[in-house]
Structure formats: structure tokens, C-alpha cells
């Protein structure tokens, strides 16, 4: 929308304690992208997301904490993570925590930035009074395995950078393995779904053709 930058800048002007804010992010079909607002990664959040519990209990604050689906998408709310596709950061916050970490490539840098902003004492807000359309996945189109690798790499960087001390009694390598396996499962599932449906359609067409020919020759 034309007023998006003005709306976000105005929100920062009205709330000096806020270090970053982001708007509602939509798919081209108007569906809300869950990455519009999220919670920080943690072993519990990862388990609930990868096990499917967050989908079964989308309104439970503890179980659906990663995508914060318990929040009303039409209400302004304090969150932990914003999508890098549309995030406005206060200059004072940037001066304090620095810019995006260049160790990340395409994924995870927004989570890392929000974590540092939050840790420095700034608030982070989701502002749905304005919105953008995000054509996600375009940068990685045609390279699914590379994207899977980059996402897993980004989460490994974040875990090693920020979670080693916080969860020092938890075997974080299990979390990294889980993230990698979840990514592989999603890739296999998407590949199967993309190929199975056309093959099923082709099989039905061939069966119909064979049945039609059999009936025709039987009548003759």
C-alpha cells in the first residue's frame, strides 16, 4: 500500500520505546503470511512447530509461540520477530546493535537482528494497520536443495550464536538435526506432491482410454 512507509515511520515516532516495527504481510492471493510476526526460536518452539502441535493448537500461547497464531492478525501487538521482507528499524537501535549479520545468506538474518534489538532493551511491534504483498520464494525458485541447505545453515548460525548459553543444558545438536530432518521431509513431501498428482492424472487418463477402447471393441 502507498501509505506503508508513512504508517510505520509514524508508529515509530509515536512510540519512542519501539526499536523496530513491521506490517501485515500477505501472499498474492491475500492470505496472511505467518512470518509477519513470530517468536524467537527455542527447543520447545521447534518441537511444537515440527511435530505439528502448533497446527493442532493454534490458539495456545505456549504451543503456537513460534508463529504466534494465538494473536489476532488485525490487532497491533508486541512480538519478538518480524519478517525481513518488511521491517522498519529505528536508527538509534541500529547504532546500538549494528546492522544485519553478513554471516547469514538469505535466511535467518531478520531473526538475528530482532534478537539483538530485543536484547538491547527495545520493543518490537507488529502493526497491521498497513500491509504489503510479498512474493516469497522467488529468489530460490529452481534451487530447492540449495534453499534447504541455506535455511538449515542459518538456523545453525543462530543456535551457535545465541542459544549456546541460554540452553546450555539442552543438547542443541538435537535441535539442529531436527531442523535439517524437518527441511528434508518438507522437500520430499513437496516433491512427491508435485509429481504424484500429474502421474495420477495421467494414470486415470490411460485407464479411461483403455476402458473406452475395450468397450468399443467389445461392442464390435
Where are these regions (language model features)?
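Short, flexible, basic/aromatic active-site loop/helix in glycosyltransferases
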Residues: 40-80
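Alpha-helical transmembrane segments
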Residues: 197-208
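Conserved donor NDP-sugar-binding/catalytic core segment of glycosyltransferases
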Residues: 2-38
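Juxtamembrane "helix-exit" motif on the non-cytosolic side of transmembrane helices
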Residues: 211-219
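Active-site-adjacent helix/loop segment of glycosyltransferases
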Residues: 115-191
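A short, conserved alpha-helix in the catalytic core of glycosyltransferases
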Residues: 3, 71-131
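A generic structural motif
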Residues: 39-40, 103
Amino acid at each position: 500500500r502507498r501509505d506503508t512507509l508513512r504508517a510505520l515511520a509514524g508508529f515509530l515516532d509515536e512510540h519512542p520505546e519501539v526499536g523496530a516495527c513491521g506490517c501485515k504481510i500477505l501472499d498474492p492471493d491475500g492470505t496472511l503470511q505467518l512470518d509477519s510476526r513470530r517468536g524467537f526460536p527455542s527447543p520447545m518452539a521447534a518441537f511444537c512447530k515440527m511435530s505439528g502441535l502448533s497446527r493442532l493448537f493454534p490458539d495456545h500461547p505456549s504451543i503456537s509461540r513460534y508463529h504466534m497464531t494465538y494473536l489476532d492478525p488485525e490487532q497491533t501487538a508486541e512480538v519478538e520477530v518480524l519478517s525481513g521482507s518488511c521491517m522498519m528499524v529505528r536508527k538509534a537501535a541500529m547504532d546500538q546493535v549494528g546492522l544485519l549479520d553478513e554471516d547469514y545468506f538469505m535466511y535467518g538474518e531478520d531473526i538475528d537482528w530482532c534478537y539483538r534489538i530485543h536484547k538491547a532493551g527495545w520493543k518490537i511491534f507488529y502493526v497491521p494497520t498497513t500491509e504489503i504483498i510479498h512474493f516469497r520464494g522467488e529468489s530460490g525458485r529452481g534451487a530447492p536443495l540449495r534453499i534447504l541447505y541455506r535455511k538449515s545453515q542459518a538456523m545453525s548460525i543462530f543456535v551457535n550464536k545465541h542459544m549456546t548459553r541460554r540452553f546450555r543444558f539442552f543438547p542443541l545438536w538435537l535441535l539442529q538435526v531436527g531442523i535439517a530432518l524437518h527441511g528434508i521431509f518438507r522437500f520430499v513431501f513437496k516433491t512427491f506432491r508435485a509429481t504424484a498428482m500429474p502421474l495420477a492424472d495421467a494414470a486415470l487418463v490411460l485407464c479411461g482410454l483403455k476402458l473406452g477402447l475395450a468397450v468399443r471393441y467389445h461392442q464390435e
